[in-house]
Amino acid sequence: MRTDAASRRNHGSGDAAGTSVNESGMIHKTVHVSPAGGAAGDGSAASPFDDIAKAAAACPGSTILVHGGVYGRIALGPEASGGADSPTVIRAAEGERVLIRPDGGTGIRILNAHHLILEGFEVEGGTHGIRYESTREAGNTPLGGVAIRNCTVHGIRGVHGICVYARNDRAPVTDLTVEGCRVYDCECGSSESLVLNGNIEGFRIVSNVIFGNNNIGIDMIGFEGTAKHPGSVRGRNPYEADFVRRGVCRNNVVWGISTEGNMAYVSDGHFDPCADGIYVDGGQDIEIAENFVFCCDIGIEVATEHSPDDNPLFRVSGIRVHDNVIAGCRGFAGLCFGGYARHLGYTEGCEFDHNTLVDNDTQIAVQRSRDNRIHRNLILGGESGVVFNESCRPEDLVNRIDANAAAGIRDRESWRAEYGPLSPDRATLADGFRTLAPDVGSRWIPAPEWTELCREQMKRESVKEQL
């Protein structure tokens, strides 16, 4: 097998620049792909490949430089994998627009690959933009080192913008990165704009911009059966690996996420406003920090949609939500945690601190949960401060809420003295989105261009409501 692989890796060297052999034994070089290339191309600048997947399979561990133009669907398999010291890098050429138009289906699909970086692509249309998937065929070895960077996905009509489905219950996807991507104008149905689902251990979702989609912005999911053990695996909890865990969701901007107009969420002739900007749905041990979420149905939510009556693992823990700014979320709440019905799984052992919540109708919604800490948050405006789900038993709503600060809440009865001081004038606590209260509110401030856009969007929403 090594001899055959080496033969394939030597193919197409031509006059490619920068050829070297790394510790993995792979030959690293720069390989060119262009719509103007031919089937007989050798991957050199003078004679490029015409097929991205062909280039990646022929030269794993190399840099695949993709030149501008329009391409069809791309399918990358395990043969495109690089090594730990030499990942396969598939990158749009500097200053050139590489557009993937799938004409239905998935724009870019990656299956059971590892140590692969996808960078600088634009996907327009189709049912999925970029999809990375692991399956049991990958065996018992974790798949690590996959990164999706600086890609743009828009015009999806069907399911996901960017999705990672780790279906292999035998071994996790590890060291996963989604960074610097833009996902917008997507009709997701009952799915999500950017989602991680299944057996994923160790990830980064950082510096992405997600906007104008009709369902959840960023979702980290567990317990849907994506990586459930098959019936042949006995004596173990079938869901023990079926959840996203140990990751970071940081420095993302998410706005304009709403189910308004989404026919998957029609109830009694009305659209149910339930799309989160950022959602942990069954994920565990995740840090959510320094994100700006505005004008969504729900800002940030931490919960599970499954019942512990069905499996004791169906609960959420180890989530820390801190130093985020959440504004103008008027569908349901700015910050929400806990199972939305009395039988659904607990959110427990989580911490929500140093967030700034501005003019969300309900600032904090508490649902089935216990032993969480909600402190050092700054609450500005809004109809209600803290609202409890009345369908839940009182003993399922026991959390510690203290040391916060609030101003301008219209329903003053929704704010108890033990939550923290309530001021009549918000100008004493904040200058715009910047906190003036010592050790309360987000210590991180969004960039001025984003705060200005937020103000404009909130004004538009206010005018729309008046009409």
Stretches with model-predicted labels:
Residues 73, 106-107, 115, 129-131, ...:
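Structural detector of coil-to-beta-strand junctions
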Residues 53-58, 72-82, 367-368:
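Short, T/G/N/S-enriched strand-turn elements that build extracellular solenoid repeat scaffolds
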Residues 67, 87, 93-97, 114-125, ...:
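Right-handed parallel beta-helix
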Residues 35-37, 46-48, 65-68, 73, ...:
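Right-handed parallel beta-helix/beta-spiral solenoid domain characteristic of secreted/periplasmic
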Residues 12-14, 18-54, 68-70, 94-96, ...:
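Right-handed parallel beta-helix/beta-solenoid
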Residues 18-23, 39-40, 46, 62, ...:
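Acidic, glycine- and Ser/Thr-rich low-complexity intrinsically disordered tracts
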Residues 33, 66, 76, 92, ...:
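Extracellular beta-strand solenoids
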